[in-house]
Amino acid sequence: MIGVCLGKKGASGKLIQSTGEFALNIVGEELKEAALRCGSCSGRDVNKAEMFSIPLEAASEIAPKIVSGSRVVFECRLTDMKEVTDHIFYIAEITACSGDDSVKQLFAWDGYARLDTADA
């Protein structure tokens, strides 16, 4: 099981609710700038993968695509949702997990002010 908490008004939560599936992608340093820019606009208004050149590929167990070259990808199927103030906590079963140990994953530093690898 895994959980993610998303704002009630966001496009990602609406997609999860409509499909019942999502992928949690832990991306690597090659997508650092794209990951930062993704927070500057809504997926409701633009295709972020196209706009920020994020490579996608088919998932093995779910319909939504996954980010190619990620450190870790969790393919998830929604099992429950809980309202938490102005957010919704999505609880899911992990249906598949894949990854690449050679990819240096990004971490959020200073809140979300900076994304970087742990050794930077």
Predicted feature residues:
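Basic, polyanion-binding surface patches
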Residues: 1-120
